[in-house]
Amino acid sequence: MNTDIYKRAGWIATTNIYEVNIRQYSNEGTFNAFAKALPRLKDMGVEVLWFMPIHPIGKINRKGTLGSYYSIMDFKAVNPELGTETDFKNLVKLAHDAGMKVIMDWVANHAAWDNVWTNNHPEYFVRDDNGNFMPPYNWTDVIQINHSNPAQQDAMIDAMKYWITNFDIDGFRADLAHLTPLDFWKKARTSIEPLKPDLFWLAESEEINYHEVFDASFTWEWMHSTENFYKGNIHLNSLYNVLAKYETAFPATAYRMYFTSNHDENTWNGTAIEKYGDMLKALTVFNCTWNGLPMIYSGEEIPNQKRLKFFDKDVIEWNDKYELHDFYKTLLALRKNNAALRTADPAVTTFHIITEGGKNIMAFLRKNDHDEVLVFLNLSKEKTGFIIKDQLINGTYTNVFTKANVGLVPDTFIEMQPWDYLLFERKL
């Protein structure tokens, strides 16, 4: 597998992602209403805004009152419920002025039954022997796109170019990327990249070979495994096995995106608090310090305790506290400013730290020649004590959250509260 076909934008290595659900973000559910949140998100340290699909939604076989964001009528239009094209263009500019990037959710595998192509280009879709459009799987509100049609591929790529040329977006999150052939994505990136070479390509997939095209991919196995761990279904060693698999099976240059929630998980499987309970903050520390890209879903900074409806209006229940705002701000600032947390950087090494006692202690060190980040996570409902038994830990470290300086050497005893986390950094 050749992962050197395309040049990855340098800014991605230290970035983070915030998934935006415009419909549920405010009572208005519009671009203009969301724009009011940009100063708060900038202060929190958010860098990439991933917008769920913003296109008009199909009416035929629609689910619920508003339909699925992923049932698209027109790939070159804006859903009027969210605002106008001018509104979106202004939002992109405001985000750019705030130092943020904007990526769009892109659905290349299926479209609405009343997609504009169905009238003039029915050959763009898979049909049965009687010429009827066919839904993929049991997704009754969408129909399957015919990936073997070169003209369809060209039309889809042209639509992607439209948003770069006219709105200056910064990349794509490919919905269910692996359901669309890799050859299409190669064709798309090869054709689109000259328009804006520093685009970000994110795949909703764990298919390893898709990293030939995509900069980053989802860590679904890790997400499900951590939930099973919290429920007591598996042991900590199983989590280490997933991380080892990621390290050996995926290219060293592959960026992996870690998350505790997204639009699907929140609606269908539960909020992050439901799934992870008291482990949530420790897991978030992991997501922001391990070798990967952290992603935050709309409302996690509250934290959101509501399962949002997928096909109907169901606004996030905001308050003025944003209890996790400063927590995320601290983590995202560390990730941005400490070079030991650069993703897939050959100058950075990750070490599992040897400890004695505390069977559910996860300890790791990330370092380069100048910086270190040291992480201890008590992934247990019990107060746990342990002893550092690793020669790599020897010096004065700064607690990232309290700013207190702490001397840590081999044989240092540490006691941690249930589901607690300790995060240190130091300059070498």
Model-predicted segments: where are they?
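Hydrophobic targeting/anchoring helices
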Residues: 281-289
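Active-site clefts of carbohydrate-active enzymes
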Residues: 251-275
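Active-site-proximal helices and loops of the catalytic beta/alpha 8
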Residues: 165, 175-256, 286, 303-334, ...
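Active-site beta-loop-alpha junctions enriched in small/polar residues
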Residues: 23-25, 54, 107-109, 177-179, ...
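Hydrophobic faces of well-ordered beta-strands that scaffold small-molecule active sites
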Residues: 16-18, 49-51, 102-104, 172, ...
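Substrate-binding/active-site clefts of carbohydrate-active enzymes
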Residues: 3-17, 23-32, 38-47, 53-167, ...
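Carbohydrate-interacting/catalytic domains
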Residues: 1-50, 56, 89, 93-94, ...
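Soluble or luminal CAZymes and related metallo-dependent hydrolases
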Residues: 30-33, 83-87, 151-156, 180, ...
